[in-house]
Amino acid sequence: MVEEEGMRSLERADLAGYAARSCRSRGRMHPEEFRDDRPAFERDRDRIIHCAAFRRLEYKTQVFVNHEGDYYRTRLTHSLEVAQIGKAIARRLALNEELTEALALAHDLGHTPFGHTGEEVLNRLMEGFGGFEHNLQSFRVVDQLEERYPGFNGLNLSWEVLEGIIKHSSPYDRPTGLIEGFLPGVVPTIEAQIINFADEIAYNNHDIDDGLKSGYITIEQLNGVDLWREVWERIDTAHPGLDRERKKFQTISALIGLLIRDLITATEANLRAYGVSTLDDVRRVNRPLVTFSSAMEERNRSLKRFLFTNLYRHHKVERMRVKAERYLTQLFESYVKHPTLLPRKYQQKMDTLGRERVVCDYIAGMTDRFALDEFKRLFEPYERV
C-alpha cells in the first residue's frame, strides 16, 4: 500500500484517539500523484460519489421495485440516509466523519437489481463458481470493475475503506482470498462498525414509511410493537390533534433519534469498559464496540420481526420476488449459453475471469429498469432488440 503525505493539517484536530485518521492510513494499492491536499478519506468519498456504480443505485430497489412509484426508497436514497445517520453518530463519538460517509455511500455498491432477491438468485446460480455476496461484490466494484483511471482498475481507495466494505454487517473472518491483507478475524475501525447499525436504523425505519405509504402495513398493526407504540403515544401526547400523516413522520423521526442516542450511550460505555483509547486498542479488544443496549437490542429485534412477517413477506412483495427470480435466472442462463449477447468488453474478460463470473458481474450491475428492459428485448417477440 502506498501512503499519502501532507493531509494532517486538513483533518479535524479534535478526533478521539480511537478514531481512524487519513494521515495514519495504510495507504492505497497503486501510487498516484494528487493535485490537491484533500485528506485520503475525503478523496475516497468523492471518488465513490462520482463513480458509475453509485449513480446506478438510483434505480436499484430496497423493497419496492423502482417502477412501482417515485416515492419509495432506492439504494441511492437509502445510502444517503445511512450516511446522514452514520455521520451524526460519528460526530458525537468524535470519529472520522469522512471515513464514515465513504463507507456509508459504498456499502451497497455491489447490490443486485430487485433487492435481496437478486442476491439470492445470483448466489444460487453461482454455486460451484464462487457464489455471490453483495459485500464482496461491493469490494469487486471499487477494486476491479470501475474503469476510470490510467494505470489501474477500480477506484484505488484507501485500505481502511476497503476493509470496512469487506467487513460490513458480516463475520470478520470470511474464508475468502479477497480479504488476505485486510486483517481477517479482526474487527474493523469503529467507523466501519457504525455503518452496520446506521444501515439497520435507516432501512428499518424507512421501510416502515414505505410500507405505510403502500398500504401493506398499518399504524394499527405497528401499535402492536412495543417500541413503535411507545414513541407513537409520546408524539400523540406532545402534539394532541396532530393529523395522522404528520404524526407518522414525527414518530419515525423520534424513533431514529431514540435508536441513535441508545447506540451512542451503549458504545461510550463499551469504550470505557474495555479501556479503549487508540485504534490499536480497538483491534486488541477484537469484539464489536458499537452496540445497542441489551434492552434496546431486544425491542428493536421485535420491530424487525414485525417487518419481516408483515412487509417483507407480504403477498404482493412475494409476487415481485417470484417475477424477479424468473427475470434474472433466464437472463443468466441465456448469457452463459450465448455469451455473444453481452457487450464486447464483457466477452473479452471471459478467458480471464470465467464465463459465469463475467455474467454475474454484468447482471449484478444492472438496475431494476435495465434488467426488465433487457428481459423484454431477449424474450418478448415484438420488443425491439
From Swiss-Prot:
Question: What GO biological process, any one, is recorded here?
Answer: dGTP catabolic process
Keyword hit for Hydrolase = yes
SUPFAM superfamilies, per the entry: HD-domain/PDEase-like
Residue ranges of every copy of the HD domain listed in the record: 75-204
Q: Which residues form a coiled coil?
A: none
Keyword field contains Repeat: no
Q: What UniProt keywords apply to this chain's record, in alphabetical order?
A: Hydrolase
Q: Which InterPro entries match?
A: dGTPase, dGTPase-like, dNTPase_2, HD/PDEase_dom, HD_domain, PHydrolase_assoc_dom
Spell out the HAMAP family in the cross-references.
dGTPase_type2
Its family? Belongs to the dGTPase family. Type 2 subfamily.
Q: What is this protein called?
A: Deoxyguanosinetriphosphate triphosphohydrolase-like protein
Please report the organism this UniProt entry assigns to the protein.
Geobacter sulfurreducens (strain ATCC 51573 / DSM 12127 / PCA)
Instruction: Give the classification, highest ranks.
Output: Bacteria, Pseudomonadati, Thermodesulfobacteriota, Desulfuromonadia, Geobacterales
